[in-house]
């Protein structure tokens, strides 16, 4: 079976469960980018509770067919498969065109937040050198490439070996032969997923907050180390 997923930034345990359980995984690269999703956000456990780490992004400019926009009397038009708004409004851009923003200190801030949250976790020092480059190096320009590199490293550390490909075109919901999890795995208003049941594991702040389920794969990895794979089954 093949699972159809959206790209994620240090995705949740539920997302990595699909990588472990399915024979093949397709990452949708032609869907429209949506804010406040796991595409550029992950959730970690801190002393204050759940904290969201969000990667700021930039939209690549689109070449707009002005003759097409004029013919639509100022309404939306489709440009290269993406919806563009005229009159100076921002266009809707698909995921493969989203770039990482170099403004601000988000890399340093994310790394400091992770150090603060997991510095006392059982496996932070063990994996620290594997994780640091994602917050200190700027070799990735596109969000999709950045997320793919993170996914590859996380799979290596957890010791899972999924077959992952990117989609060659946008796959419409309920019309593909894959099991579609794109709207199932999201931080707000997720759809039901009978295939996933969070298994409690040790967390640094469990005595204060109880078990916080389905956080970033970082939470599972840094708390459980090599045993992480058992919580994806």
Residue ranges and their predicted role:
Residues 1-76, 83, 87-233:
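Residues lining hydrophobic/aromatic ligand-binding pockets adjacent to catalytic sites
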């Amino acid at each position: 079976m093949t699972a159809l997923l959206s790209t994620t930034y240090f995705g949740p345990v539920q997302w990595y469960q699909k990588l472990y359980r399915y024979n093949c995984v397709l990452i949708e690269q032609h869907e429209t980018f949506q804010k406040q999703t796991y595409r550029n956000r992950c959730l970690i456990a801190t002393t204050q509770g759940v904290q969201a780490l969000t990667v700021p992004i930039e939209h690549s400019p689109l070449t707009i067919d002005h003759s097409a926009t004029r013919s639509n009397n100022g309404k939306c038009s489709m440009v290269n498969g993406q919806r563009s708004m005229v009159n100076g409004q921002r266009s809707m851009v698909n995921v493969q065109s989203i770039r990482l923003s170099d403004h601000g200190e988000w890399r340093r801030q994310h790394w400091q937040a992770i150090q603060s949250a997991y510095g006392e976790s059982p496996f932070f020092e063990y994996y620290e050198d594997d994780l640091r480059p994602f917050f200190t190096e700027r070799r990735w320009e596109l969000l999709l490439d950045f997320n793919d590199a993170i996914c590859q490293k996380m799979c290596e550390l957890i010791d899972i070996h999924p077959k992952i490909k990117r989609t060659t075109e946008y796959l419409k919901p309920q019309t593909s032969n894959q099991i579609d999890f794109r709207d199932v795995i999201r931080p707000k208003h997720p759809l039901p997923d009978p295939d996933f049941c969070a298994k409690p594991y040790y967390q640094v702040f469990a005595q204060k907050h109880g078990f916080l389920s389905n956080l970033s794969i970082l939470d599972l990895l840094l708390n459980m180390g090599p045993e992480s794979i058992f919580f994806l089954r």
